[in-house]
Amino acid sequence: RAVPGAGLRVPIWLLGSSLFSAQLAGQLGLPYAFASHFAPELLLEALALYRRNFTPSDRLAAPHAMAVLNVFAAETDAEGVRLATSMQQSFARLSTGKPGRLPPPVDDIAAVLTPQQIESARSRLTYSAVGGPETVQKQLSDFIALTQVDELMITGMMFDKAARIRSLEIV
């Protein structure tokens, strides 16, 4: 019984990136978090399925949803776009079976990726907030309006640790 949370009713969430996880969370009456930061194509359908299948439980009376969102915030829109190129390159590498360390950002993504790789990476980053403070704030507000989520979880894989910290400060 050396569990730190024993007897504290620590909230249990179901985190998923599929329709099955959404349906299961709803049926079990659990809060649901969707991994839209890497699996955006099912986000809206998963949230609708979760809410439609929600059964109240002793832990939760109504649906409570969260979505994970990529954020690349910087002082300017151009710098936010540049910071996001690390993830674009990373997704391109994953799609070709060549994962590795997160690459540094580049000024011209078209110089390092093919048009098909750029499109594939952009589709994986559909739900991202990228740019300067005002742009990112609007994109976050638009995302919340679109999804009606109760909470956001933010991630932002950036090559430069200081840029990542600054991005979080901006948000």
Where are these regions (language model features)?
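Residue-level signal for short, function-critical loop segments
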Residues: 18, 38, 71, 158
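Internal, glycine-rich beta/alpha segment that forms the wall or movable "lid"
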Residues: 1-28, 41-45
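Hydrophobic faces of well-ordered beta-strands that scaffold small-molecule active sites
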Residues: 11-15, 32-35, 63-70, 150-154
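An alpha-helical appendage that flanks or caps ligand/catalytic pockets
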Residues: 1, 41-148
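Generic C-terminus detector
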Residues: 144-170
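Flexible loop/turn segments at secondary-structure boundaries
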Residues: 21-22, 41-42, 74-76, 160-163
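Catalytic domains of carbohydrate-active enzymes, especially glycoside hydrolases
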Residues: 28-31, 146
